[in-house]
Amino acid sequence: MRGFTIIQNILTAIVIPFLALIIGLCSFSGIYIFFKIIGLFGISIDSFNEVDSVPLEDFVITGVALGMGITAWGVTLVIFSGLLGGLFRPRLEPGRYPLKSFVTIQWAWSMIFHKIALFFLPFLVPSFIGNTFYRLSGAKLGKGVQINSAHLNDAGSVTLGDGVVIGGKAIINAHLTEKGELVMAPVNIGKDALIGMGSVIQPGCVIGEGAIVASRAVVPKWT
């Protein structure tokens, strides 16, 4: 597509303030909790103008309030990013697409929300919050799935059967770029399969029930 680089640069310039907007909007919960906690203990922000005269317990309470606020912001950011990721996920047929095309732009736009979630998602896996993020993003997860990775990329094209365990820092990609093309294909992992720590699953892979993928192994596309 002619002029793709120019379009890419323009969209990048637009995306950066958009990211800032989402991050800022999701901070409302953290700000509320922070001021609510310090208010319950009668602490005034103005008192820190004379920091040397502030009682030690006020520092402790303020620190706890700050930690709770940051955590609330992070959880809100992850859930909201999951909602947007699911809403805007591309409905693309498996196949190869020119890298310099509107399909690539559509796919890249959907991945933005996962990148935003990565501010806090690594601290929330494995947990029901992490699983909720992936479900909201479009992943099909069976019962008892344990995901200890923040890198289930293209979640809308990933299916995990009951009891699947995804090891720490494993990467599951339903996309690949090669030779000027964007390769898209769903990934299906069968019931009770184990994906080892640090392994890489490429697009189009079908992992059978009860299969074990060794740590740091690479499963090539369409395996």
How would you name each of these model-derived features?
Residues 1-135:
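Terminal amphipathic alpha-helical/low-complexity segments used for targeting or macromolecular assembly
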